[in-house]
Amino acid sequence: MDRLSGPDLPAEEGVPCHNQDMVVWTETGDIGARLRRLAAALDSIPEAREEWPFSTDVGRLARSVRDYLLPRVENTSRPLTVVFAGPTGAGKSTLLNSIAGADVSSTGALRPTTRAPVALVAEEHADDHREIGGVECQLVTGGAPILKSMTLVDTPDVDSTETNHRIVAETLVDHADIVVFVTSALRYADAVPWQVLRRARARGTDVITVLNRISPATAGAMVDFRTRLTAAGLGDHLLTIPEHHLAPEADRLPGLAVRSLRKRLVGIASSREAHAAATLQRVTAATAAQVGALVDEIEQLIERRDEFHDELSFDLSSELEAIALHGVTAGFHEELPEAGSGLRISRWLRRNRRRPEEIPPLETRLADRLTSLVRGEMRRLVEGYQPTPRREAMTDVVDSQLATAVPSPVSEWLSFVRRIGEPQPGRQWSAEAALVDSACSGRVTAEADVLFGADAGALVERARRELVGRLQVIGAGVAAGITDLAYPGLGEVDLEGLRSAHAALVSRFALVHA
């Protein structure tokens, strides 16, 4: 941390920032706890996806709540954070040095000049500014009285070719109480800086716009820039600084060149408490609006998810109601001749008679085959469901689910079939196989008719109803799994926390214009 002994900023008569409101806090109560819950609730929201984008950058909003709102609610005496931001070559660092009256931030022709944020801070406030929004700052301490009311921060270029520099600059803008937006006659119309400018203003941050390096040849830029600011709803208050040809070793402009900006900052510093309250009020209102919009979007998304789940569940349930699995026991026993006499039926019964020790292995094979058939049919039904998103990943998820979900219900159903069959001695296997075939295919087979007689229809209906019910339970689980895949993490969202925090933000603060 560097120690700066530059000249104090003069105590000139202040000029209030153009969009400042005078506010009072009506009640804070447990707003800190509500904000912490809001940050946690925002953390619970899954990342936006192409299928359901959010209008708000949720991660950025969570950081703003945690790193901007909370510290200011808990410590209303902290100095204002004044961030100098702008495009490449706008002269931010030179301007900050000139305001400070000392060499705070490096300048030069090599771009980018400012690679890490530099904060000019009063020594007693240094700990509060080692990090801003999670971004580590290089600290330079100074003794100017204004630093008791505000910290001045130089940032990397908002349009830097290095992604990390842009992210750092945008993060600092998101955590500023005041943004001094510096651009030049050559760069004032560039698209990227305007995006940052609009976002800062949208979140309720005070913005001081500075058009640097004005010359007679570029005088038209001042008029055009002011027109653009007005059209964008940013007002027409524009500070201008003329072009100065500095010596190569010079890092500062003459004091007269930055007099209007220095005067503006001194004026804000003289009413720091009111300005901080006004800014906090506006950022709170903007945050409440963002959270409200986010709640609406998530509620709509949950509604879409529920509709998706209900439609998929209904379709699977309907398909399973009419499921027809054929040939479940093929090869396990000799089939009944199509046109047989009593003699042939007797022969068929004798040939399919199994000793008690032979039955368990047959039942195991039957369970494996039925499990395989059920998994295949369920997979076919799901793959035929057209609205299913993320089809590639879905197949793996469904296969994994079915591998664990099917075997146990199938085995339990086969045990149920054995219990209700009540076969005559020696006919246990024949009865089980006939009842399984009939229930799976949805029709009473000839074998079941022979074995169960007048009771065949009722037994088959009972077995089938039990089978379909178990399959529908599996189908419901598959539908839930596919829904989770289509809308990952949505079930973990603390929607009630979002609603509660939103209500607190709306009701706990009041704006009183003086």
Q: Residue locations for each model-derived region?
A:
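Switch II (G3) loop of P-loop NTPases
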Residues: I146-T163
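Extended helical scaffolds that flank P-loop GTPase cores
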Residues: H18-R78, P254-A257, R262-H513
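Conserved G1/Walker A P-loop phosphate-binding module
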Residues: V23-S149
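N-terminal amphipathic/basic-hydrophobic helices that include classical n-h-c signal peptides
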Residues: M1-D21
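Short secondary-structure boundary/capping elements
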Residues: L61-V65, S160-H165, Y188-V192
